[in-house]
Amino acid sequence: MKQESTVDLLLDVDQRPSAGKGILLSFQHVFAMFGATILVPLILGMPVSVALFASGVGTLIYMIATGFRVPVYLGSSFAFITAMSLAMKEMGGDVSAAQTGVILTGFVYVLVAASVRFAGTKWIDKLLPPIIIGPMIIVIGLGLAGSAVTNAGLVADGNWKNALVAVVTFLIAAFINTKGKGFLRIIPFLFAIIGGYLFALALGLVDFTPVLQANWFEIPGFYLPFSTGGAFKQYDLYFGPETIAILPIAIVTISEHIGDHTVLSQICGRQFLKDPGLHRTLLGDGIATSVSAFLGGPANTTYGENTGVIGMTRIASVSVIRNAAFIAIALSFLGKFTALISTIPNAVLGGMSILLYGVIASNGLKVLIKERVDFGQMRNLIIASAMLVLGLGGAILKLGPVTLSGTALSAMTGIILNLILPYENKN
């Protein structure tokens, strides 16, 4: 099912480039996703190797679910950082709640996919209008602002070297985002991390011990929900309130999923939400997310960076994305490579996080502006105000065995208020 393309494609979805050209194009997609994909596990303290492996496997799962008809790459999701970090903190560093929560989020995707298949999409628009999505994104973005500032060393007892590295990293990312041209502008995270890392190295803040100790070939450091006799670390499937609090993030990520596929459809001149259909794209995304979390990785999501590469190169070949997934899987087994990534100082991550969390929050405002949410309507002011204060103010609501806080409480509050508050009659 086709529509008019906004880009004159050199290679369509079902076409393939020559072998040599194809490898170069695939590496270009790897570079595009790399900075963001490794940043999430670094912030969360997860093995980078698992995130790379899961992104590659997740992309292949997505392609199988969609019949290899959509050129989408799946990488680590920023949206879950706040909720997963809080779950780990509340569990004393144990990842059980965080991983179980993301596994269940994948199941939520599957349930929504089934509902879309049999009931259409109108109920999504009714349940999740922009007045809920916008404040939710703001809460997600600002929820970990304090940790970003701490990692950056911008605190009373902070080290000036760390603060300087964080500022330099932030400025590199900011200038690339505003002044970068072409492909450079698509990979600001990667260049900012490299620039910040080199600056930290010059200040003596990098320890290469992990690289020297690592083997050239290593199996990714999977975390699994069962015993492997010590071969891999273990977590438990945990279904407490810390786990349930992660599920509402799906509200935002499903909306992002729809938006990404809409943009990609316009670039490729296809209607991917109809063929293969939203139910199949959600199914692939959901299964990929559950598999990633099962292995000890972060949630997966569709990557706008790779959509940008398609728009820039005018090559929408699914085979190029598929091979990029295989490259990511191969990189996850290079022990010294993943060990080198683990030596990136917290100050670099802090500088990136300040920009990242701020951009996420600002995108929440962008949703409200783009969708022209009428704040002349008192009901909209009330919904947004309640969501922001409860989501960022540390509010906790205990309902029997279930405890709601942060993004979960914010989401539930917004949904309920949107359903019960009447619209004003301006006449």
Positions of the model-derived regions?
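Membrane-embedded alpha-helical modules
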Residues: 94-207, 323-427
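Juxtamembrane interface elements at the cytosolic ends of transmembrane helices
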Residues: 6, 34-35, 169-179, 187, ...
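Re-entrant/interfacial helical elements at transmembrane boundaries that shape
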Residues: 38-43, 73-86, 259-268, 299-312, ...
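Hydrophobic, membrane-embedded alpha-helices of multi-pass small-molecule transporters
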Residues: 20-36, 161-169, 187-188, 219-260, ...
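Intrinsically disordered, low-complexity non-transmembrane regions of multi-pass membrane transporters
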Residues: 1-24, 208-232, 266-273, 281, ...
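Interfacial segments of multi-pass membrane proteins
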Residues: 85-91, 177, 306-321, 327-332
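N-terminal signal-anchor module of multipass membrane proteins
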Residues: 1-74, 78-94
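Membrane-embedded helical hairpins/re-entrant loop segments and their flanking transmembrane helices
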Residues: 9-19, 45-63, 245-318
